[in-house]
A protein has these predicted regions:
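Hydrophobic alpha-helical transmembrane segments
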Residues: 10-17, 45-51, 190-206, 301-308
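Membrane-interface alpha helices of multi-pass inner-membrane proteins
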Residues: 58, 280-296
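Active-site lumenal/periplasmic loops and adjacent helix-entry segments of GT-C-fold
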Residues: 115-231, 241-250, 259
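Membrane-embedded alpha-helical segments of multi-pass membrane proteins
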Residues: 13-17, 70-74, 197, 201, ...
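Membrane-embedded, hydrophobic transmembrane alpha-helices
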Residues: 1-99, 322-326, 334-356
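Perimembrane helix-loop-helix junctions
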Residues: 302-330
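Membrane-interface transmembrane helices that cradle and orient dolichyl/undecaprenyl
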Residues: 261-280
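Transmembrane signal-anchor helices characteristic of membrane glycosylation enzymes that use polyprenol
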Residues: 103-130, 330-345
Length: 356
């Protein structure tokens, strides 16, 4: 019970980390700072930097504890940088957010209660899918063997080469690093902390979209979020994102389905207001870079989502510059897809041991 309570508290730890990483990018912008948007940007920046560190260590065949030490140092550096960057704008941003919350306390309380109920139902459920077990198994195997992606988490067999499907998707290895650092059991971290983090992030992106759609009308925003969460809880099928949010909550695909793809829709709404907003385009590009770390499915789905939502802006706003910008944001996923195809065709392979 004590461990479970601590795991719930670590959800706040994740959001603080995301905020500090995001502050490195968005800090110093005066009263323009948005707390939710900073967390959102920090999520992708965090995982993008992590996968750079992780792949560097993997290609040098170094153990997990080396990555843990290096990433701990990087987290400390980025946290300090985030605090320095946001020192002038964090207080005004908090005051602005607090004023809006206090003026709409009933709506936020209702959203909070429903979110807590949603989290409780999901965390107390028995998640038995094979894919979901992979994430805990890979995290536990990495910690137990002090290696990175060198053992099959289902069988325990040694792998002579890195599976390219998970080579860039280092989401579960980040779990292993944090579990090693904080001495948290992988099952507790994945099942409780990361599942709760995913649910809160999904509600946060709904709130961000609601603010863009309805402005400061908290009544409409509340109804919007309640309807979305109700749909997630009662419309669980293999064809909906709700399946990942309710039965495969601590998978990277859960964040892809319920944070990344809705996030691109949020970007689309922002660009409808101002198609030339450079910060919004940079955020979309950051998402395109960071999403493949969460799940390799991002390699195809993110470019497809961008093509469906963003490219039509060129017609709607009569701006041809939208097309090359959207293409640039699609490029990371396309490149990783080509690399995976080359791996499947035996054109490229990365071994788990020195070949020379």
């Amino acid at each position: 019970m004590i461990q479970a309570t601590g795991a719930v508290c670590l959800i706040a730890f994740n959001f603080i980390l995301y905020f500090l990483f995001g502050s490195v990018l968005t800090g110093g912008k005066g009263n323009r700072m948005s707390l939710t948007r900073t967390v959102f940007a920090g999520l992708f920046f965090y995982y993008l930097l992590f996968t750079i560190f992780c792949i560097t260590v993997m290609l040098r065949w170094r153990p997990l504890h080396v990555l843990t030490s290096a990433w701990t140092f990087m987290m400390a550096v980025m946290s300090i940088a985030g605090m320095v960057r946001s020192r002038r704008c964090i207080i005004p941003a908090i005051k602005k957010a607090s004023a809006f919350v206090s003026g709409n306390i009933a709506g936020f309380l209702l959203i909070g209660i429903i979110t807590i109920v949603f989290i409780s139902v999901i965390l107390m459920s028995y998640q038995f899918t094979l894919d979901a077990s992979y994430y805990v198994g890979n995290t536990a195997a990495a910690i137990r063997t002090d290696t990175i992606n060198m053992y099959d988490p289902f069988t325990g067999d040694w792998l002579d080469h890195y599976e390219m499907r998970y080579f860039f998707a280092t989401f579960s290895i980040n779990d292993a690093v944090i579990c090693s650092l904080l001495h948290v059991h992988p099952l507790i971290w994945c099942k409780i902390t990361m599942a709760g983090t995913a649910i809160v992030l999904s509600v946060m992106i709904l709130y961000m979209a609601g603010r863009k759609l309805f402005g400061t009308d908290m009544r409409k925003i509340t109804v919007f979020i309640i309807l979305a969460e109700t749909a997630d809880l009662f419309m669980i099928t293999i064809y909906s994102t709700a399946a990942f949010l309710t039965t495969r909550t601590y998978e990277g695909k859960c964040l892809l389905a319920n944070v990344v793809l809705p996030g691109i829709l949020y970007i689309y709404i922002c660009l409808l207001e101002d198609v030339k907003d450079r910060r919004t385009w940079l955020l979309l590009f950051l998402m395109a870079l960071g999403a493949p770390v969460l799940s390799s499915s991002s390699n195809m789905l993110v470019p497809a989502m961008i093509a469906v939502t963003i490219i039509p802006l060129a017609v709607l706003r009569k701006d041809l510059w939208v097309i090359p910008k959207a293409a640039a944001c699609m490029l990371p996923g396309i490149i990783l897809t080509v690399i995976y195809i080359a791996y499947v065709k035996n054109m490229i392979v990365f071994y788990t041991y020195p070949t020379r």
